[in-house]
Amino acid sequence: MMYLLIFLVSLLSCAGQLCQKHAAGASSGAGELRHRVRWLAISLLLLGGAMLVWLWVLQRVPVGIAYPMFSLNFVLVTLAARWLWREPVSLRHGCGLLLIVAGVMCMGVNL
């Protein structure tokens, strides 16, 4: 159950950050300002929801276990940006992502 909640925090946070990226990519103009504000508002809702779930998780899981698992957010954001915007992922970046996943697996086995 805790794994799922921590993963939910990562998903909400990832979605919020992707909404920020989408808002930042909007060009200037009156219609674009509404578009940007809408995506930023969605981002705030997602990140706020992530924070509330995260606080609930921290009440029940040692921070030494929970926080490293939250680093999966780096992996999710990178993969989503690659898929959505075709952002490049270098070999070194990919190796770093694999190390993050391996570290999370090593540290999260006690849950």
From Swiss-Prot:
The chain crosses the membrane at residues 39-59, 61-81, 89-109. Pathway: Bacterial outer membrane biogenesis; lipopolysaccharide biosynthesis. It is found in: Cell inner membrane. Keywords: Cell inner membrane, Cell membrane, Lipid A biosynthesis, Lipid biosynthesis, Lipid metabolism, Lipopolysaccharide biosynthesis, Membrane, Transmembrane, Transmembrane helix, Transport. The keyword Repeat does not apply. GO terms for molecular function: carbohydrate derivative transmembrane transporter activity. Disulfide bonds: none annotated. NCBIfam families: PRK15051.1. Heterodimer of ArnE and ArnF. This is Probable 4-amino-4-deoxy-L-arabinose-phosphoundecaprenol flippase subunit ArnE.
